[in-house]
Amino acid sequence: MKQYTDLFIDFDDTLYDTYGNAEIALHELFDALHLERWFPDASVFYDEYWQTNIDLWTRYSRGEITRDYLIVERFRRPLSKGQGLEPDEKRCLEVSDLFLDLLSTKSGVVEGAHELMDYLRSQGYRMHMCSNGFHEVQYRKLRSSGLYDYFDTIILSEDAGTNKPSARFFDYAMQQTRAGKTTTLMIGDNFQTDILGAKHYGLATAYFNRYPQYPAPEPVDYEVTSLRQLMDIL
């Protein structure tokens, strides 16, 4: 008898290649808005955006800032640096809407994502997506990437009213899925939000470490460096 019946699976950069897809979308945004007027090239704009975005998402996951602040600020900062003039909130929202429209059409997945999900489905696991991503974008990304139909349940932080790694997020996920703590495994690439959140809640964890030169800072149940390695565990 298998140890787990339910899998909580992170989406962004665990299955969906958010980093790669965002790079493509930001280059398209750069061209559409003619940002070469303020940046030497698209890579400079991309680097400015990504550094800001990582910082803001970390703070958002900790509940320190709101969704609306993140959406505006992640474009206000890089555009301010490039233009030397701070854009107003309306302009930042327009840029954000265009970026999210571009991103949500991208279909790139992490290597081995479809093979893994096909395998897990064949083994009879119940699969539940657990994500801090925004509601209106995640469903479009799920469909663009061909991953939507694999999931039994979609758990989003906006529906839960709180973000991973909060215990309240996992309370909500357990209620929605009717999963049991001892038979549920959390799979994710973000050690702080996915792995520590689930571990502190009492769930087993599988850390997808995409950068193996930086091993897990504390013990986990499983650590893999590719999605295909999860097939050997499950």
Task: For every predicted segment, state its role.
Residues 51-98:
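A metal-dependent, Asp-based hydrolase signature
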Residues 24-28, 48, 74-77, 115, ...:
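Alpha-helical elements of Rossmann-like donor-binding domains used by nucleotide-donor carbohydrate transfer enzymes
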Residues 8, 68-72, 87-129:
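Short, acidic loop-to-helix structural element flanking the phosphoryl-transfer center
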Residues 1-9, 14-51:
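Active-site neighborhood of HAD-like aspartate-dependent phosphohydrolases
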Residues 22-30, 49-53, 75, 96-100, ...:
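Hydrophobic alpha-helical core bundles mediating ligand binding, dimerization, or RNAP-core interactions
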